[in-house]
Amino acid sequence: MSFRFQTGAELPELVKHPTARQLVQYAGASGDFYEIHYDQDFARSTGLPGVILHGLLKAGFLAQLVTSALGEGGRLKTFEVSYRGLDLPGRPCRCRGLVRSATDGEAELEVWTEDPEGNRTTVGKATVELA
């Protein structure tokens, strides 16, 4: 295990640097071709500041945060997120987490993404089984 899951411990931060190209690639892989994720003009016509990250891409970033801390032998048991704000390509997306409780074999985590201003744009929780 590469991280010690103790109540109150912060998970090692993961910073992602999403690009417009990555959004197009993700659209192809996921089948989510909604134009707000790759067409600047369309996104702006809907009132957005420009193209935005796919919600499930941000969920994937958070799952990576958790599984990276978990290391080999552990298991992600439950995972859920709620989208609260926008993240834009070309701006860092910080993935953070906190151990809310830990027992001998399991830990409950709070996870979230932050924009560069420190606003939580995606919040969630996870349960992990420890090796």
Specify the residue positions occupied by each region the protein language model found.
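HotDog/MaoC-like acyl-thioester-processing domains
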Residues: 1-12, 89-131
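Hot-dog-fold acyl-thioester-processing enzymes
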Residues: 1-75
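Mid-chain, well-packed structural core segment of small domains
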Residues: 66-95
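Hydrophobic residues in beta-strands and at strand termini
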Residues: 18, 83, 128-130
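Acidic-enriched, low-complexity/disordered segments with a strong bias for Aspartate over Glutamate
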Residues: 32, 39-41, 87, 104, ...
